[in-house]
Amino acid sequence: METIAKHRYARTSVQKARLVADLVRGKKVAQALEILTFTNKKAAALVKKVLESAIANAEHNDGADIDDLKVAKIFVDEGPSMKRVMPRAKGRADRILKRTSHITVVVSDR
């Protein structure tokens, strides 16, 4: 049984979040949680929260055994970018993109 959890509009860039997602793809959930706990990146905390949510969803909604679960799929898609302005010298301004991403985790007992 596959169970899904999503975090939409996460305030991290897709490029940074995908680095973390690649670490846990295909792993058992216990091992994935250990990896994320000791990964020193902001995106690791976001991915860990989504993974914990997926585990809770599997346990509550599907009655799955946590020991059998593994990370079947994990992917990070690009969300909308917030456009901000940073003042520069001589009256100019630069545009800053505050990027967001959609983190999706699918856990499965197969």
Swiss-Prot record:
* Taxonomy, superkingdom: Bacteria
InterPro entries recorded: Ribosomal_uL22 (IPR001063), Ribosomal_uL22_bac/chlpt-type (IPR005727), Ribosomal_uL22_bac/org-type (IPR047867), Ribosomal_uL22_CS (IPR018260), Ribosomal_uL22_sf (IPR036394)
Its cellular-component GO annotations read: cytosolic large ribosomal subunit
Query: Which GO molecular function terms does the record list?
Result: rRNA binding; structural constituent of ribosome
Does the keyword section mention S-adenosyl-L-methionine? no
Q: Name one GO biological process term.
A: translation
Which keywords label this protein? Ribonucleoprotein, Ribosomal protein, RNA-binding, rRNA-binding
Q: Could you tell me which PANTHER family the record lists for this protein?
A: CHLOROPLAST 50S RIBOSOMAL PROTEIN L22-RELATED, LARGE RIBOSOMAL SUBUNIT PROTEIN UL22M
Q: What protein family does this chain belong to?
A: Belongs to the universal ribosomal protein uL22 family.
- The protein's assembly and partners: Part of the 50S ribosomal subunit.
Role played: This protein binds specifically to 23S rRNA; its binding is stimulated by other ribosomal proteins, e.g. L4, L17, and L20. It is important during the early stages of 50S assembly. It makes multiple contacts with different domains of the 23S rRNA in the assembled 50S subunit and ribosome. The globular domain of the protein is located near the polypeptide exit tunnel on the outside of the subunit, while an extended beta-hairpin is found that lines the wall of the exit tunnel in the center of the 70S ribosome.
Against HAMAP family, the record matches this protein to:
Ribosomal_uL22_B
Q: List the protein's name.
A: Large ribosomal subunit protein uL22
Q: Which gene encodes it?
A: rplV
